[in-house]
Amino acid sequence: MPAVSKGEGMRGLAVFISDIRNCKSKEAEIKRINKELANIRSKFKGDKALDGYSKKKYVCKLLFIFLLGHDIDFGHMEAVNLLSSNRYTEKQIGYLFISVLVNSNSELIRLINNAIKNDLASRNPTFMGLALHCIANVGSREMAEAFAGEIPKILVAGDTMDSVKQSAALCLLRLYRTSPDLVPMGDWTSRVVHLLNDQHLGVVTAATSLITTLAQKNPEEFKTSVSLAVSRLSRIVTSASTDLQDYTYYFVPAPWLSVKLLRLLQCYPPPDPAVRGRLTECLETILNKAQEPPKSKKVQHSNAKNAVLFEAISLIIHHDSEPNLLVRACNQLGQFLQHRETNLRYLALESMCTLASSEFSHEAVKTHIETVINALKTERDVSVRQRAVDLLYAMCDRSNAQQIVAEMLSYLETADYSIREEIVLKVAILAEKYAVDYTWYVDTILNLIRIAGDYVSEEVWYRVIQIVINRDDVQGYAAKTVFEALQAPACHENLVKVGGYILGEFGNLIAGDPRSSPLIQFNLLHSKFHLCSVPTRALLLSTYIKFVNLFPEVKATIQDVLRSDSQLKNADVELQQRAVEYLRLSTVASTDILATVLEEMPPFPERESSILAKLKKKKGPSTVTDLEETKRERSIDVNGGPEPVPASTSAASTPSPSADLLGLGAVPPAPTGPPPSSGGGLLVDVFSDSASAVAPLAPGSEDNFARFVCKNNGVLFENQLLQIGLKSEFRQNLGRMFIFYGNKTSTQFLNFTPTLICADDLQTNLNLQTKPVDPTVDGGAQVQQVINIECISDFTEAPVLNIQFRYGGTFQNVSVKLPITLNKFFQPTEMASQDFFQRWKQLSNPQQEVQNIFKAKHPMDTEITKAKIIGFGSALLEEVDPNPANFVGAGIIHTKTTQIGCLLRLEPNLQAQMYRLTLRTSKDTVSQRLCELLSEQF
């Protein structure tokens, strides 16, 4: 080993490390370590005082021994003494030893804290940096108690050097993450926000990380950071600016800072219009740069550019308010779906899953369905295939449900075992949600059991039985299908359960066919009996006693089975008891009693799909971010508006015209009695005392209301405390709205009371009912409220939702307009050109037509215009108008009292950037209101 002088290094340490490495056995290593420990102990206890170099060397040896896994029970005081040295290397080793070996319960903690305080007060940037690093590395609650009040002062002090500011910001971030309750908010918060304008890259990057974390828990304190972050981001991404151009990384200016600024902006709702315009320009610039040819072939360039791009797309999705940006983001991600880099394909699929939840970009996402299906078949990485499954699930609607379900079933046969159960749940949900033909639903679930029976949970096969029982029109087909499926030589046990239950209820519907006579049905089921587990055998015994009631001709055969020793003397108590009771019942009961006891199962009253609940449980606990998941659960096809679902022919089925496939409950009939008291189910209470305390509409409420005219799902309102999300569906004159109240803070909301305020005339035209919500909303959680809606007659105004609650001892009062508008009760109507103009001429009275000529408020994009007309509820009639640039629509407004036909014509003038909208309906008030609503969309 080359000689190392005393001034350049520690020769003794180097020799010791070399000796340890040269040890041939564990015993030799321990012997050498014990020898060194004895030497160090003697040096520390010797009469001769050690100089700083020797202390440093011996402390380093102790540190090395500790890192080898051996206990160290001395040397701590010597390390603490090094903290008071004025030599950098000695102080550095002292802090290193303290950070690694000293715990918060040490008797030396007071001495250590004093040394750290001295260094923080020294104004020596090197010593201050070492002290801050030590505090951050230890990061204990005791450290937070001692220094959480001092570090913010260092951070915002005008004479603090940039390197120390950077360390102080990161140190404070570490303490806040471990002990947020010990970091006081004060005057420094407003000053730390201005660090976003600092010219030192390290300072502004560290400050952005700190502000982002603080803003998530204290949004009101840091809301001024939004405009500063947008301004700084604009200066970075705009090529004309010279801000931080010295920090360009492979032709990408300050990529890490750009990502952090974009992430900070996701902590807040869309900013006010002035700032929003500048932010939109930034996002457009980032999307434009993504389309430019790469300036370097090196991977660092593409990584930096794509990091900024994906964070920008996340912000676009979070705001969900700019249709053009959403569609552009979708198109950009679509290009990445076939990129040679696996990580980019994964990230593109993941981001598109969220984009599919937006009304504006759902159609754009659907255009990539073939690429996603191909990824499902060809990707070698299982995580990418799983994201492809998630995206197919998110983009599914009635127009592509059968194709997507078929592809998922095909993939399920070869899918990785770790994700099979989740795929099974998703297939079951999609098949149920979009089943217009219930024979297809039955076939799909049985195929699901055949392919992945081990992963089909009880919730799935319970659900298919519930739906078959609730629908007369599919019972015969289900019985025939399960009978045929059971004839396979090898059947999964779940198929035996489904088959046994359905044949026990509806086997009589196929008994007329000689190929499925009662005896054949019984023999088929009994051939599987001895291969099944105890719970399945118990179910089959119940099927047998049902057969006794349905088919008297097989009664004797079944009694012989029940009477056999294998049943009456079965080791399992449940099977034995069933055999004894069923045998006795079949022997002593008269035909009438038997028919009464064993009558057909009544329809299942259900409020929530257990399959959907199970999928959510697999995805994690409910939080505010579940609003994004809620958006994905699309129950209405955005491509074609609400579609009719065949009503059940069962006499006991629910009266709702919407076949509630997800079991979310039918719309109840209008109440005939007086409304319940304030603790009851009605949310509408216009005479309540709280009406006098209703707050004015929240800022931006009108804009958010207008956005929901052509969409049914999304975030209606968001501030620093509360997020309100909506998901709604409408069928003819009935509707149902799910409201999600999300607590964005870590503190409980108390006395949480939502109230719906309706004007007198609106209350007579619109019937609204709901159940009360829990008055306590935990931090980071959400509660759901369901409003059942019935349109009695046409209306103009919208109800106002007022939310009152207590947060941190202060009273909060928020009011927003609830987007229940007349067009929600639109039923699209297809008609030929001749029929359209014939009907147009019939509605020629002046009071039946309303026309509006107005300036375009948004870019005049054909596809977005089509999507908005369809989202408005009207059918979009192609090739009807002689001018192909015009848009023509037709539909019927359904109310309880009448149906109102509606025709519309939208004529764009691209040169003048103007529109002319003409509406003709059989009722003048309807024409006027629909014209007002639709005009605001363009």
Swiss-Prot record:
A 1,2-diacyl-sn-glycero-3-phospho-(1D-myo-inositol-3,4,5-trisphosphate) binds at R11, G12, K43, Y53, K57, Y58, V59, C60, K61. Keywords: Cell membrane, Coated pit, Endocytosis, Lipid-binding, Membrane, Protein transport, Transport. Widely expressed. It holds the Pfam family Alpha_adaptinC2. SMART domains: Alpha_adaptinC2. It comes from the Eukaryota. Transmembrane segments: none annotated. This is AP-2 complex subunit alpha-2. It comes from Rattus norvegicus. The lineage of its organism: Eukaryota, Metazoa, Chordata, Craniata, Vertebrata.
